[in-house]
Amino acid sequence: HGEKFYSVGEYWRNDLEKLKEYLDNVGYKTDLFDVGLHFNMYDASKKKQDYDLREIFEHTIVATNPMAAVTFVDNHDSQKGSALESQVENWFIPHSYAIILLSKDGYPCLFYGDYYGIGGEKSPHQWIIDKLLEIRRIHAYGEQINHLDDPNVIAIQRTGRDERTGCVAVLSNSEEEEEIQVEIGKEKAGEVWQEVTGSEYEDVVIDEDGNA
C-alpha cells in the first residue's frame, strides 16, 4: 500500500528506445517487462548455433536500466497460438531461466506455463527451474561477471559474498563440445564445484591458479 505498492508495466515493443521513452514518460515510477531480452532468447532458440550468444544482453532494459527491468522468458502473449507468438524453444528454456534467475540485475518473473505446464500437460522444465531457484537462493550472490568471448559458449559468474556462495552458469548453443575458462580466485584453489543441472559434464576442480 502507499509508496510500497509495486507496479510493473507491459509495453510489447522489441525496441529499446521506445521502452526507455515509456519509462521516461512515467518518471520511472513503474518497472517494465524486458521484451528485448525475451526476443533475444527467442531468437537464440530459433537460430541455435548460428546465434551469437555474446549478444544475449544487447538492446535490453536489464543491461541499460537494470533497476527498472522485469526479466521473463515467456508469457501468455508469447505462447503458441497467441497473436504475439514468440515462444522460446524447449531446448533453450533452461538456458533462459539460468540467465534471468542467476543474473544480479533484473526482477525475474516465472511463466506459469513453463513451471506447471499448459493444457493439462506437466511441464518438463519444472525440475530445472526448481534447481535454478535453489542455486539462486543459496549461491547467486555478489558481483556478476559475464564471460562473452565466444559466440557459442558464454558464462555468467557470480563472485559470491562469503566462502560458501558464488556460482557459474555455462551456456552453450553449439552442437560440438565447447570449453570455457573462468577465473574463480586463488583463494578457492582445490575446491570442487559441483555440476548440478544433471548434464553429462563432471564436477570441476579449481586449479592452483584459481581457474575452472
Segments and roles (model prediction):
Residues 1-212:
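Active-site-proximal helices and loops of the catalytic beta/alpha 8
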